[in-house]
């Protein structure tokens, strides 16, 4: 496996910050190498510098998205932030009492547990009143899992 120089790692730090607003500390160097090493192999590249050049060439948007997917960490589970859902219940109940439609956008929704948690709260609080939940994420890989809506029991803590 190729090793990554400090200069190469610094380029990837800038890349993921520019692409996703994610700051990778120096402690994440091993993680980055582990996640991207198979991409070097897949393209027959010998260095992380070569892989970075591929990403910057502007000729492979799919590979850029793959790199972003690999460098994002997606940890989530149902009802992960209880206080947020308590607040949502209050706001939704107020909107329901005024017969207003309700729309929630879950940015950085990862694999969708938050979206489905929001939907459960809105279904409970708003019943037949109109409501909608929209989820988005920079990682197309996790959005695919969110669309499937199948989760292991461990995601419900």
Where are these regions (language model features)?
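Conserved S-adenosyl-L-methionine
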Residues: 108-110, 137
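Conserved AdoMet
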Residues: 1-105
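Conserved RecA-like P-loop NTPase ATPase core
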Residues: 88, 109, 146
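Extended basic-aromatic, gly/pro-enriched interface segments that bind polyanionic ligands
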Residues: 129-157
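Alpha-helical elements of the RecA-like P-loop NTPase motor core of helicases
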Residues: 86, 116, 144
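Conserved SAM-binding loop of SAM-dependent methyltransferases across substrates and taxa
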Residues: 111-128
């Amino acid at each position: 496996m190729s090793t990554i120089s400090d200069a190469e790692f610094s380029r990837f730090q800038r890349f993921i910050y520019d692409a996703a607003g994610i700051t990778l500390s120096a402690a994440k160097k091993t993680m980055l190498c582990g996640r991207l090493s198979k991409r070097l192999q897949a393209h027959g590249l010998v260095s992380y510098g070569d892989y970075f050049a591929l990403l910057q060439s502007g000729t492979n948007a799919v590979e850029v998205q793959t790199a972003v997917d690999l460098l994002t960490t997606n940890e989530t589970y149902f009802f992960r932030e209880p206080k947020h859902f308590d607040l949502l219940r209050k706001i939704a109940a107020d909107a329901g009492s005024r017969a207003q439609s309700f729309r929630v956008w879950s940015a950085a929704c990862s694999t969708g547990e938050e979206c489905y948690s929001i939907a459960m709260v809105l279904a409970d609080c708003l019943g037949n009143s109109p409501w909608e939940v929209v989820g988005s994420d920079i990682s197309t890989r996790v959005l695919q899992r969110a669309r499937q809506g199948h989760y292991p029991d461990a995601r419900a803590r």
